[in-house]
Swiss-Prot record:
Subunit structure: Part of the 50S ribosomal subunit. Contacts protein L29, and trigger factor when it is bound to the ribosome.
GO BP terms: translation
Organism: Shouchella clausii (strain KSM-K16) (Alkalihalobacillus clausii)
The protein's name in its UniProt record: Large ribosomal subunit protein uL23
Source domain of life: Bacteria
Signal peptide region: none
Gene3D superfamilies (UniProt xref): 3.30.70.330
Keyword RNA-binding among UniProt keywords: yes
PANTHER family: 60S RIBOSOMAL PROTEIN L23A
Function: One of the early assembly proteins it binds 23S rRNA. One of the proteins that surrounds the polypeptide exit tunnel on the outside of the ribosome. Forms the main docking site for trigger factor binding to the ribosome.
InterPro entries, sorted: Nucleotide-bd_a/b_plait_sf, Ribosomal_uL23-like, Ribosomal_uL23/eL15/eS24_sf
Amino acid sequence: MSNARDIIKRPVITERSTELMEDKKYTFEVDVRANKTQIKDAIEEIFEVKVTNVNTVNYKGKAKRFGRYTGFTPKRKKAIVQLSADSKELDFFEV
């Protein structure tokens, strides 16, 4: 994972994550193998901001049935990133 864009997959846009944006906390889906230091460096490189804190949440895959066969959805990892007070805000809704 040498590329920052391989670590950060997409922003997570939910009701809770939009409320956290008011406190300069942004939520991203990240690669499951990435650690907090790699996530921090990737966000700072892509968006040119200063990150003060990174919290991560691991989700295991859910069991899904297809007829008599059981499969699993992929596991995923979510990162909640706190920006410094002097950092610019990130705008995901630009076209």
